[in-house]
Amino acid sequence: MKTFTAKLENIRRNWYIMDASNKILGRFASNIALRLRGKHKVIYTPHIDTGDYIIVLNAKKITVTGNKLSDKKYYHYTGFVGGIKEQNLKDLMTKRPEYVIERAVKGMLPKGALGKAMLKKLKVYAGTEHQHAAQQPQVLEI
């Protein structure tokens, strides 16, 4: 018996909608990462992108446990001397709630070109409106 390897021309990608309302950030992000990688499919192959497209709605309503709203810090470097900036989760959720979910999922995907291709299939929106009705996405309850 030979080992099965998925081929790009045989992969069917589905579109799913996930609602982030009252979901815990880490658990929600790990479920998204699993589906973006395609690990829920029988044809999963580690070096080929077999995952589906995920649309996340209501990113501004996601929750975290404990004191993470005030304690969790997000850092970025501007490129200048002394230019490291920090922002806590509460401030980031008011300005860019989509980024919080994207960053959590990005950390759970492979690093490199394959992970970047997987992350492009993630579409995150702060509210309930999205522009992917033509793809006829299915609602995915978790």
Curated annotation (Swiss-Prot):
One of its GO terms (cellular component) is cytosolic large ribosomal subunit. GO terms for molecular function: mRNA binding; structural constituent of ribosome. GO terms for biological process: negative regulation of translation; translation. Pfam families: Ribosomal_L13. Keywords: Ribonucleoprotein, Ribosomal protein. Part of the 50S ribosomal subunit. Belongs to the universal ribosomal protein uL13 family. This protein is one of the early assembly proteins of the 50S ribosomal subunit, although it is not seen to bind rRNA by itself. It is important during the early stages of 50S assembly. This is Large ribosomal subunit protein uL13.
